[in-house]
Design a protein with these regions (language model features):
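Polytopic membrane enzymes that build or remodel cell-surface glycoconjugates and lipids
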Residues: 2-480
């Protein structure tokens, strides 16, 4: 039998700990999930008062307007290649109709499941349940972008993918401990389902490679190998970006969207996860090299993975908020969009690993727990105050979307399609194949009035016999 991973060999005051058994485990899990639910309800109280973004209405409407799941797959799978999310969304539309609270509850439940699987995976990486629970607490209170809960389509993509992302890690950990074809099949199946939710899940393959090569055949951590792989992956991703942006003929934007995530979106999560395990207590973990590499990896994340308009802001955010152990996302929720949902879990894992290593180095376990408690409380308070403050700025247009929903739903007639114009110049490769089939209504395609790309479009509809006009401007449909 191959040796256990190095993270499972860690022992001592701040190392491994046996998991709680029986009723205690259920009690701890229940208390933790209840606390997380209470926090989400408090922190996102302002967002819950609004409806969905216009894109979410688009996907919701398609699922509501058509009885056959086959239509959902055949119609917009061409531009939105995530069949597992289609299936989730179609089922959710049937179960939840258009009631926002039901989607919020489903999103919170999916997020809680992600945290639970994350804790299970972190137990082997961090060498014990207490530190894994600490990492889960940080992820639960600090790294839940409001978009992930608020956007019923885009958020579901991240949440559903996250479930199978962490499941793949767990199955692979078990496969390493006891190899066998059955366990390998579980790894492959979970990876396939993660890919069916989001194509960037293929970046789990570098995770498995880094995991294997970092520990080596004897199961001992080899951090220099990990740093070499990090440098190689970074160089490979930069080379791919250069190719897609400057060399690839044709449609570089489409290529970047489809291929870029395969190479880089989540490998930073993978690498940071491995590095957390590559530095167990007593191995000289807290070194300038580790902290420098940590910062460099996240600088690369902001430079190469975030939208262009946010890159400069992201680098400034790193420089300004660099503080001991809590230099991320404290006052700036918008700096962590849904695209960094999985990397955020890797960051939470790195925090727990650093606190664990610090406590071991100083031989003061309580200090690590105290710092962890301060970090969790500070991040929870900061987000709980900041998110409602951001809501009027970011979500106010969403309130006007509710007017459009009310108008369209008043005209909802099963079997009679309502065509809603979507600005094809924004992302023609994604939206042109489907051209936005919306709800089930009483209008014909001639009732759609396209305008310029800057102004978007106008939709003429009827509410109880009265004409009403919806305009698409700055990303939102508004009633006029």
């Amino acid at each position: 039998m191959p040796p256990a991973p190095a993270s499972d060999q860690v022992s001592g005051a701040v190392g491994a700990a046996r998991p709680p058994s029986g009723g205690r485990a259920v009690l701890f899990a229940g208390v933790g999930l209840a606390a997380l639910a209470a926090y989400l309800a408090w922190a996102y109280r302002a967002a819950f008062a609004h409806f969905f973004f216009d894109d979410e209405l688009l996907y919701l409407a398609r699922a509501l307007a058509h009885r056959s799941p086959a239509y959902v797959f055949t119609t917009f799978v061409q531009g939105f290649p995530r069949p597992l999310v289609h299936l989730y969304f179609f089922a959710a539309a049937r179960l939840f109709d258009a009631v926002p609270a039901r989607y919020y509850a489903a999103g919170a439940a999916l997020f809680a499941a992600n945290v639970a699987l994350f804790v299970a995976a972190a137990r082997r990486i961090l060498g014990g349940w207490p530190w894994a629970a600490a990492a889960g607490a940080v992820a639960g209170v600090a790294f839940f972008p409001y978009e992930t809960l608020y956007n019923v389509a885009a958020g579901a993509t991240e949440l559903v993918c996250g479930l199978f992302f962490f499941a793949t890690v767990i199955f692979y950990q078990r496969y390493r401990e006891r190899p066998g074809p059955g366990r390998l099949a579980l790894v492959a199946g979970a990876l396939a389902l993660a890919y069916a939710a989001k194509e960037s899940a293929l970046s789990l393959l570098p995770l498995l490679v880094v995991y294997e090569l970092t520990f080596g055949e004897k199961g001992k951590p080899q951090p220099w190998r990990a740093w070499g792989l990090l440098a190689a992956l970074t160089a490979a991703y930069v080379a791919l970006e250069v190719y897609l942006q400057f060399i690839l003929p044709g449609a570089p934007n489409r290529g970047r969207y489809m291929l870029g995530p395969l190479a880089g979106l989540n490998w930073i999560t993978a690498t940071l996860t491995i590095l957390a395990a590559a530095f167990p207590p007593g191995a000289g973990a807290l070194t300038p090299l580790k902290l420098l590499g940590w910062l460099a990896a996240w600088a690369a994340a902001f430079v190469f993975l975030k939208p262009r308009r946010e890159r400069g802001f992201g680098l400034a955010w790193i420089a300004v908020t660099l503080a001991p152990f809590i230099f991320w996302q404290v006052p700036i929720v918008e700096a962590m969009p849904r695209y960094l949902f999985l990397p955020a879990f890797g960051f939470a894992l790195m925090l727990a690993a650093t606190l664990r290593d610090l406590a071991a180095k100083l031989r003061r376990p309580r200090l690590g727990w105290a710092l962890g408690a301060v970090a969790v409380a500070g991040l929870a308070l900061a987000n709980g105050v900041r998110i409602p403050a951001l809501a009027p700025r970011f979500l106010a247009p969403g309130a006007r979307v509710r007017d459009g929903v009310r108008i369209i739903r008043a005209n909802l007639v099963p079997g009679r399609p309502l065509y809603l114009y979507r600005d094809e110049l924004l992302e023609p490769w994604q939206y042109a194949p489907v051209n936005a089939v919306f709800f089930g209504g009483a209008l014909a395609p001639t009732d759609v009035l396209p305008e310029t790309a800057a102004d978007g479009a106008r939709l003429l509809t009827r509410e109880r016999g009265r004409l009403a006009l919806l305009s698409y401007r700055q990303g939102f449909w508004r009633a006029e």
